[in-house]
């Protein structure tokens, strides 16, 4: 068989030529002398057509019939080398198809669990490693890739240097109650919830820096917008004002959206995303509204028949329904600026002349997607930062390096962070954040954690001593024994289902 191996997204350059594609059979149909193969290879999906007379003409009656029968018997997710002539096809969304001239099976696939019918979410998450192969899941990961690519491209063009912060940390960047703790050779350490504090040191050395990597939040939020492990881009910069920071954030988000439109148009089409809406978000300026003005606006409209948020007072933090209403009211991504200091991080710089408010901003995405960026100017005055830490009862010895940044040539500086999964969810137009990351880790009900995570762990650990109990009986017993510090974090991938905290199961 010919081995001019190309990928599906390259076929447009080989019209009229014979090529070979390594792919998986996503679906198959046909009858009689025709077999229609839906192929995928990670770059795209498209159709290959096998016609029996063509096989007989090339290989003879017996061998050609055998080849065609192989094509007709192909099962879902069988891997193949398919050789054929590339042809344009205006009827196809992809625009091309392959007239098959030869076919070779690489790896067979029998009884593939995710058939082309509807499946429940729990089933799909239990089979996440296979669900990733489906057309929509491939499209979401292609959009994720385009966003990551555009991130590096944007910061390179804007003079930022990639600066890697540690994942294990001895201090908290934000709320210490949202940290995963771990033992570090007898010392208490945390899984990073943000690289920001270290990035500030980088900004004092390099001017403009950004980081991109996994972060962890021990939030027990069971919403479509929360994960306990996700990927975050943090940026930090010296000598920029608050308004300049907002300009940079707006340009960044628009660059991400444009990057997806340019690099993954087929993915957007697969997901039936409203591309005109995305283009409008690029073309129109983002709205900027002060926190207090947003509260007043919410109060004025809370009696409207189309609102579904609870009453909110000045000084309260927004809930998801408030954020949704605000962004939908303006119809474009909206910065809410100058929140109360009472529920924001200790390092945020107060608004000049108004110490009750801080120079910060959350960017709220329209269409109900809520906050996608959080940023602020950092307190650059040593005495003011120490006073704030004392007010909050913080142990300054844990932040000596951070305070040093204010002692040796401090400058105005700020930064922002964006959870990549929230951005992917927004741009892709999907309903739940768990689809925006290959293997999501999120809070799950205790029952599902015990049954889907702990039971396989028990049976694999104690396989030489089989338990004469059902899963339900084991689950019932463990309810009385489960450790107090258990953080019930569920995940779709069995290997990572053992939790982040040290824990023990004690058997009576």
UniProtKB/Swiss-Prot annotation:
Name one process (GO BP) from the record: asparaginyl-tRNA aminoacylation
- Database matches in Pfam families: tRNA-synt_2, tRNA_anti-codon
* Alphabetized UniProt keyword annotations: Aminoacyl-tRNA synthetase, ATP-binding, Cytoplasm, Ligase, Nucleotide-binding, Protein biosynthesis
Q: How does it assemble?
A: Homodimer.
Q: Name one GO cellular component term.
A: cytoplasm
Q: Which source organism?
A: Streptococcus suis (strain 05ZYH33)
What's its top-level EC category? ligase
Enzyme Commission designation: 6.1.1.22
**Which residues, if any, are the signal sequence?**
none
Give the location in the cell: Cytoplasm
List the GO molecular function terms: asparagine-tRNA ligase activity; ATP binding; catalytic activity, acting on a protein; nucleic acid binding; transferase activity
Q: Which reaction does it catalyse?
A: tRNA(Asn) + L-asparagine + ATP = L-asparaginyl-tRNA(Asn) + AMP + diphosphate + H(+)
Q: What is this protein called?
A: Asparagine--tRNA ligase
Family named by the database record? Belongs to the class-II aminoacyl-tRNA synthetase family.
Matching NCBIfam families:
asnS, PRK03932.1
